[in-house]
Design a protein with these regions (language model features):
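Small/aliphatic-rich secondary-structure junction motif
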Residues: 2-72, 164-228, 234-235, 245, ...
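Gly/Ser-rich helix-loop-strand patches that form or flank binding pockets
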Residues: 4, 10, 24, 28-30, ...
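A conditional alpha-helix N-cap/helix-loop micro-motif detector
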Residues: 24, 87, 111, 138, ...
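Short glycine/proline- and acidic residue-enriched helix-loop micro-motifs
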Residues: 71-81
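Active-site beta->alpha loop and helix N-cap motifs at the rims of alpha/beta catalytic domains
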Residues: 79-86, 90, 109-110
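A structural motif corresponding to the C-terminal end of an alpha-helix
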Residues: 89-105, 219
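Short, flexible loop segments at the rims of nucleotide/cofactor-binding pockets, characterized by
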Residues: 105-108, 134-137, 175, 223-228
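A short, well-structured beta->alpha microelement
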Residues: 110-117, 223-239
């Protein structure tokens, strides 16, 4: 049973971007499950890509039919129809997922730059969940996800498939304000917690562990601790790879990054990662 605590970082609105790709549908299912557990509102958004619409208006753009493999001119009317159909499929998927999870939900269709529209929607949510790869299906972070992560939104969770989202939480703590928010987020999500203590030496690690333990003791919570002394994200990724189910809660400016960009660091993980920025 989840420990009930008062937390100003409580997650009340969970945003998911839906484009009907397998990865976005997996993100939707995960978001619905989490919304049900946290009694949060599920917010879905589908973005009609303005760049595709402008491209279709050009007289020299061709497309290849999926079934016929024949080349034909890409027409604006056909593009509009395809976008409407995709939005309808996204809305249907949203309704089904919300119904199964029995959560409050809203769904909107926006038109514009995908990154700009999603960042605007994310600014009004407490947590943004998106699939790692989009339509490509590759394990590496997709182009849209990379841009959104680099933009530094509040809290963003990257998932690869339909993972269960309340297993062990591995939150990274280094004493910074961001790591304190990461710890608050872990507290709001669940009681099965591990804390990765990031430190320059063992004395600092002991002090930081005592700091976290004091916070958790006040809330009646316990945690397992792992020290990451002079470590990097690759070492953390290898550590959690041995866990059957794990979500890493990672501060966006963690010392573990060691000069890597966030997208580069995220490519090292095989489990869901929740960024706190």
């Amino acid at each position: 049973m989840r420990q009930k605590v008062s937390n100003p970082d409580k997650i009340r609105r969970i945003l998911v971007a839906i484009d009907a790709s397998p990865q976005s549908l997996a993100a939707l299912e995960a978001a619905a499950e989490l919304a049900a557990d946290l009694d949060a509102e599920l917010v879905g958004v589908y973005v009609e890509d303005i760049n595709l619409i402008r491209l279709a208006a050009l007289p020299v753009v061709l497309e290849t039919g999926e079934a016929s493999a024949q080349t034909r001119r890409l027409e604006s009317s056909r593009m509009d129809r395809q976008l409407r159909n995709q939005a309808a499929r996204a809305a249907q998927a949203m309704a089904l997922a919300a119904s199964r999870a029995q959560v409050r939900w809203t769904f909107t269709v926006a038109r514009g730059s995908i990154e700009a529209e999603l960042l605007h929607a994310a600014s009004e949510a407490d947590l943004f969940i998106l699939g790692r790869a989009g339509w490509s299906g590759k394990r590496r972070l997709g182009s849209t996800a990379r841009k959104l992560v680099a933009a530094g939104n509040n809290r963003t969770m990257i998932i690869e498939r339909g993972e269960r989202l309340l297993p062990t939480l591995m939150t990274v703590y280094d004493g910074s304000d961001q790591s304190k928010r990461a710890l608050d987020t872990a507290i709001s999500l669940g009681e099965y917690m591990a804390v990765g203590i990031v430190a320059e030496d063992e004395d600092q690690a002991k002090a930081l562990q005592s700091e976290v333990a004091a916070i958790l003791d006040l809330l009646g919570l316990k945690a397992r601790y792992r020290w990451l002394v002079r470590a990097d994200t690759r070492e953390l990724a290898n550590m959690v790879r041995t866990q059957e189910e794990c979500i890493v809660i990672l501060p966006g400016e963690s010392p573990l990054l060691e000069g890597k960009s966030l997208p580069e660091a995220l490519d090292e993980f095989e489990c869901p990662v929740l960024l706190v920025q």
